[in-house]
Amino acid sequence: MAIIPDKQDSTVLERKQQKLKPPSMYKVVLLNDDFTPMEFVVMVVQEYFKKDRETATQIMLKVHREGRGVCGVYTRDIASTKVEQVVTHARQAGHPLQCVMEEA
C-alpha cells in the first residue's frame, strides 16, 4: 500500500493490485514394471484417481505398452499426496509399482 496525502491534510491509503497467477500443476504418472499385476494397476487408478473402469484400463494399458501413463493433473500438494498414497498402497500389497509427479 502507498500513502498518498490529499488536499485537505488527511492521508488516504492506496491499495496496489497484486496479480495472482494460477498454481503450478503437476502430472501424476504411473511407471511400468514387470511384476505389478495389471488388475492391481486398474484398481489403483479407480480408487485414487476416481476413474471409471474403462478409463482406468486404458491408462493401465498405456503404462504397460509405453512404460508410463498419466493418471491426472493436480496442484503440487494434491499430486504429492496421491503419489504417496499410491506408493504406500503398492508396498503394503507387496508390489513394486512406481508413481511419480512431473511438472505439467
From Swiss-Prot:
InterPro entries: ClpS, ClpS_core, Ribosomal_bL12_C/ClpS-like. It holds the Pfam family ClpS. One of its GO terms (biological process) is proteolysis. Binds to the N-terminal domain of the chaperone ClpA. Involved in the modulation of the specificity of the ClpAP-mediated ATP-dependent protein degradation. Belongs to the ClpS family. This is ATP-dependent Clp protease adapter protein ClpS.
